């Protein structure tokens, strides 16, 4: 097992990466890495909120303002030099700051934290 620490001592290399909007990814996996980094590299980055910045007030419905396929944007991915499938990667978050003065969370039929699954039943209309 290989344990890589991305946020290590202060004398480690630092990657500052602020992605352009068109560099955000909307799926997990399959995208080429934005950077190759060495174990111990500290990453200073930014990402968009779960609705791609489209919801800007409490009276906006996410289903009405987000373009299809533009929810949950991702920053990266980063390729860790020397990491192999099966390795354990340790990531230490040193600091987390909100990008805006507001936050958002929501759920709607078939999506969100309060929906039933094949393992968790809820009382509600069938989809």
Language-model-detected regions and their locations in the chain:
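Bacterial Sec-dependent signal peptides at the C-terminal "C-region" and cleavage site
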Residues: 2-12
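N-terminal, charged/glycine-rich beta-strand/loop interface patches
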Residues: 12-127
